[in-house]
Every structure is written in structure tokens, then in C-alpha cells.
Amino acid sequence: MTKDLTSGNPFKIILLFTLPLMLGNLFQQFYSLADTIIVGRFVGVNALATVGATGSVNYLILGFVIGMCNGFAIPIAQLFGAHDDSDLRRHVANATWLCIAWGVVLTVVTVALTRPIMELMQTPADIIDGASTYIGWIFAGIPFVFLYNMVSAIMRALGDSKTPLYFLVLTSAVNIVLDLVLIINFNMGVLGAAVATDVSQAISGVISLIYLIKKFKILHMTRDEWKYSRSTCRRLSAMGLPMGLQCTITAVGGVIMQWAVNGLGSSVVAAITAAGKTQNLLSCALESIGTAMATYAGQNLGAARLDRVRSGVKSSYIMVVAYSVLAFIALHFGDVVIIGLFLDTKTEVEIVAMARDYMFWNSLFFIPLGALIVWRYTIQGLGYSTLAMMAGVAEMVARTVIALVLIPVLGYFGAELSNPAAWVAACLFLYPAYLWTVKHLENRLLAGHLAMQHSAVGD
């Protein structure tokens, strides 16, 4: 069930590890896409805008959860690469305690503050009630988000990227069926979409946990290994919190953008919702390459093979460029068909035109987006998650400037430039940070090797 990524051809290893991740991410996007498509087609444009108005707030909180789980898995991957099984199990146990604690706190706080948050976002009056209901139920499912993402992050850290995919295929199907039943048959509207998402996440998390317990013998723990350890929790938090905060900081820029976009009206919100969902779907492959690099870099750091990390990054560049070109071509010829999944292209002509423009400008910058994802996840896998978090600050600043300066002047075109500007700003920070991180670690490994040689000579 486990897989060692410290030997073999880097391109082949990363590609084979990425493919299940990509399919898994696609199916995870189907949770959101199913809600959006069914709501947009069967309830109406206002309902589509209702779901879309919650997008940045949703990512703000759930991005923190997912980022933190991925961060907790980095030391686990490093320990697996170093073949330190007992300490690995202690880290898994303490990651479990941390997830339980954070899950309870975040659920209580976010559910209690749902309505004030949507008011602060200047959500249009005609959709604020539905938006508050939808995001409130999504926040109620935070424990299930923790459960699935922590279990799947552990599996990936141990080299298994296929198993989480199988569970997501099943639960995505459940999500779509529940969407259709609750929204169409029971007329539950956006509430039905939220409930379907929560139930699907719960199924995915529970099944994944049962599988992890039964199949991964390396994780069979003693009572002593289950004990809370302050030092272990500190190490896990040192990786998890910066990765969670990186997603949150990036999302803060998105929240500010959403605030500015909401002021342009519900039609603009609907256009960006449809275009944004499409972009998220297409960028899944890039995120998957990055996620693969985090595990690959972590295991190879544990094995003291930084030369393989450099080779892995170069291999990832090739994948990013090839995919970005194909995605741009696909969008160029199929954008109307894709938007037609969300909207009636015959009656919502103006909204469709805005969505097409938004997708065009974003797809032009998929290569820098892919590069920043590779650098960010590699830096995280090497244990320098605070550096990666700083790139989120660059993205946030870029989006904030556009929201406060360009959108009031350029209107919708300013919103179209927000993601490309944020991606370029992050690249300007991340590339030098990646070079420094690898060089710094190489020097540390060399110094340690020379010290060992000196000690051996002295003996």
C-alpha cells in the first residue's frame, strides 16, 4: 500500500503519482460543480449567484483546513523516507488530536458567525439569505472535511495516491444523486446542495478511515504511540499552521475581491462563478502536480536526495507547460459549451460573454500558475512552509490593490486581471525562495557529511 519515491525515474514517478491525484481532485471539484450546475440550471441565476457569493469565504475556511492537513502530512512523508516507523506513528496520532481540536473550534465559530460574515461581504440583498443558509451548512460539515483530508494526506505521505481516488469516485456519485433528489424532487434549493455536499464528505471520510485502519499495517500503533506529545504537536503545527494560513492569506485577497465584485451586481457574480468553477476544474491538474511534488520532496529530503528534488522540479515544469497549452486550446474552442453547463446560453447572453472573457484572461496565465504551484509545494515538502506562506501574502496584496484601485476604475475588466496579477506576484517571490531553500539544504547536508567524515578521522 505504501510507495517509496526516493528511487526511479523522477518524471515517471511524479507523473504516475500525479494521475490519481488529478482524477481525485477532479472528482472533489465535482462536489462543487454538481451544486453549481444543478442550482444554476434548475433553480436559476439568482441561486447560482447565491452559491457563488460564498466561494471566497468557503475557500478562506476550508482552504485553511485542507492546507493544515497537508502540512501535518509533510513530517510524516519525511519520516517515511527516513524509515523511522515508530516516530511516524506518533506523528499520525498527534495529527489526529490536532484535527479533532481544530475541527470542534472552527465548526462552532464559523457557524455562529455565518450571517455577520455575509453581511460584511456586502452580499447583494436579493441573495444574502440563501448565501447565509448555504455556507452555514457547509461550515457545519467542517469535521468531515478534516476527516477525509487528513486520512488522504496520510495515504499520500506514504506513497498511495490511488486509494483516495476510489473513494472520491463513489462519493462524487452520491453527491450528484443527492443534489438531484434534494434540489429537484424535494425543492430544497441551495440548502439541498449544501446538505448533499456534507453527506458526501462524511461518506468519503468514514470509508477512507476504515480503509486506512485495516490496510496500512505500518500505522498499527501501541498505546504509548497514541499519547499526546507537546514536541510532536509543535513540529506538526510548525508545518500545518503556515500551510493553512497560506491558503487563508491567499483567500483573504479573494474575499476582498469578492467584496468588490459583489458591488458590481448579481449578474457579474454569476458570470465569475461560472468562469471560476471552470478555472478551478482545469487547474486541478496543476494542483495535483504540486501535491505530488510535496510528497516527493518530503520523502527525498528524508532520504537526503536533494539532487532528485531538483530533477523532480524540472520534470514538473515539463508537465505544467504541456498541460497549460492543452487547457488553453480546450477553453478557446469549448468555452461556450462549458459555460452552458451552468447557464442558458440563449437567454443569458451578457453573462455568458463576461464569463468567456474571464476564462480567456485566466487561461493565458496557466503556465505561471503551474510554476508557482510547483515551487510552493516543493518548498513546503522540504519543510519551509513559512516561506511558501509569504507567497500567499504577495497574492493577497496584488488582489487587494486590484479590488481597491482597478475595479472602481475599470469595472469588470479589473476583476478579470485579479488572478493573473496575483499569480505573477507570487512567482516573483517563490522562484528565488525555491532556489534559496534547495541551496540552503544542500549546504546543510554537505556540512553534516563533512562533520561525520571529520569525526570518523578523529576516531
Give the label of every model feature segment:
Residues M1-T18, I76-G141, N185-L241, A297-L364, ...:
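Short alpha-helical transmembrane segments in multi-pass integral membrane proteins
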Residues L5-V43, S56-G71, P75, I100-T107, ...:
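N-terminal transmembrane alpha-helices
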Residues L16-D35, W137, Y148, T171, ...:
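Transmembrane helical elements of multi-pass membrane transporters/channels
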Residues F30-A49, M118-A125, V181-M188, T248-L281, ...:
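Helix-terminus/linker motif at the lipid-water interface of multi-pass membrane proteins
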Residues V39-Y59, A125-G130, V190-L191, T232-M239, ...:
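Interfacial/gating helices of multi-pass transporter permease domains
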Residues L48-V108, V145-P164, A271-D335, L369-A391:
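Small-residue-rich hydrophobic transmembrane alpha-helices
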Residues L60-G63, N175-L180, G205-L209, L281-C284, ...:
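Hydrophobic transmembrane alpha-helices of multi-pass small-molecule transporters
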Residues C69, I138-R156, P164-S172, A193-V206, ...:
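Short runs within selected transmembrane alpha-helices of multi-pass transporters and secretion channels
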